[in-house]
Swiss-Prot record:
ATP binds at residues 41, 82, 85-87, 148-150, 191, 201, 238. It comes from Prochlorococcus marinus (strain MIT 9312). Residues 276-352 are annotated as: Head domain (RuvB-H). Belongs to the RuvB family. This is Holliday junction branch migration complex subunit RuvB. It is found in: Cytoplasm. Residues 202-273 are annotated as: Small ATPAse domain (RuvB-S). Its main location: cytoplasm. The gene is ruvB. SUPFAM superfamilies: P-loop containing nucleoside triphosphate hydrolases, Winged helix' DNA-binding domain. It catalyses: ATP + H2O = ADP + phosphate + H(+). DNA binds at residues 330, 335. InterPro entries: AAA+_ATPase, AAA_lid_4, DNA_helicase_Holl-junc_RuvB, P-loop_NTPase, RuvB-like_N, RuvB_C, WH-like_DNA-bd_sf, WH_DNA-bd_sf.
Length: 352
């Protein structure tokens, strides 16, 4: 039960707009993708490429909810950045024929912020909270009764002037997204009826995404080129599309063409210090640092200090792909370069 400032009276739960400016609920309309490349998201599950098992599970849960005329159970989506957690939240709302209101956990600073969001919901709507692992404790505790019983239990005021109030909420679906599942407290995690991991994408799936996007931007990417781009995209659609945009920039400005080949991709990405493995300068610095330690396990904090980078960034941005391609292994004593990783970094004369 959260304590709310006594400055908010019994009839003053429609919090002022300026007090919620950081977390103002935004209703996401059906996307009109005419010429806006930033709205090139899939708008149906059929258009969403990859994650077939996850889509099948969600489809069953959504159809069952529609059949029972109930909101979908609260859903937790977790996985690496750029895999489609936000897009899936929008698709869930669309399939449930409702609206999706969005917020990011760092912007929900005070209990009154989450109160304002919850009171603004209508029956059956989806509330999407990104980076949900970053909710503070008081805000998180307010969500417990909201998720389980669709009510808010508030203590207003303090000491002898304190009073309790329960406010009923419309039935809604909370969709949480996180890159750090272990950072979510057990009480909050257990209140999600559906919990799904979003996996890395296969090269074939990424190739489809690249081909679709290249048609949207009217660029001719040949089959070999899209396959090459897919292989260096770290299994992540966001990276694939970002690289394609950079290659497009190079093709238009330097080569004056709208035809993309493998050779053009290599030249373009070389100018951005990205090599044929999809590794950038930071990745190669990381591998070089481990290589200098002569097969001695090295702690993450030591690596971060040596590179002048944040340990969290290295752990969640750099390391997953290096592990995925077999260049890095984690041991209880620290990080180790694999034989494959050593062979790669030894072959590099890093003059990017």
């Amino acid at each position: 039960m959260a304590i709310i400032s006594s400055n908010i009276g019994d009839n003053d739960f429609s919090l002022r707009k300026k007090e919620l400016r950081l977390v103002d609920s935004k209703i996401i309309p059906e996307e009109k993708r005419k010429n806006n490349l930033n709205l090139a998201r899939p708008i149906t599950f059929q258009e969403f490429i990859g994650q077939e098992k996850l889509k099948s599970s969600l489809r069953i849960a959504i159809d069952a909810s529609i059949y029972r005329k109930e909101p979908l159970e609260h859903t937790l989506l977790y996985g690496q950045p750029g895999l489609g957690k936000t897009t899936l939240a929008f698709l869930i709302a669309k399939e449930m024929n409702t609206k999706c209101r969005i917020a990011t956990a760092p912007a929900i600073e005070r209990p009154r912020d989450i109160v304002g969001l919850l009171l603004g919901l209508k029956e059956g709507e989806v509330l999407f909270i990104d980076e949900i692992h970053r909710l503070n404790r008081l805000t998180e505790e307010l969500l417990y009764s909201a998720m389980e019983d669709f009510r808010l239990d508030l203590t207003m005021g303090a000491n002898r002037g304190a009073r309790c109030r329960t406010i009923n909420l419309p039935r809604f679906t909370l969709v949480g997204a996180t890159t750090k599942l272990a950072s979510i407290s057990a009480p909050l995690r257990d209140r999600f009826g559906i919990s799904q991991k979003i996996e890395f994408y296969t090269c074939d799936e990424l190739k489809q995404i690249i081909d679709n996007f290249s048609r949207l931007i009217s660029f001719n990417v040949d089959d070999e080129a899209s396959s090459h781009l897919a292989k260096i995209s770290r299994g992540t659609p966001r990276i694939a599309l970002r690289l394609l945009r950079r290659v497009r920039d190079y093709a238009q400005v330097v080569k004056k063409t709208n035809v993309i080949s493998v050779n053009l991709i290599k030249k373009a990405l070389n100018s951005y210090q990205i090599d044929e493995k999809g590794l950038d300068y930071v990745d190669r610095q990381y591998l070089s640092f481990l290589n200098q330690n002569k097969n001695i396990p090295t702690g993450l904090d030591s690596i971060a200090a040596g590179l002048g980078d944040d340990s969290s960034m290295l752990e969640f941005v750099v390391e997953p792909y290096l592990i995925q391609i077999g260049f890095l292994t984690r041991t209880p004593r620290g990080r180790l370069l694999t034989a494959l990783g050593k062979k790669y970094i030894d072959s590099k004369n890093d003059n990017f």
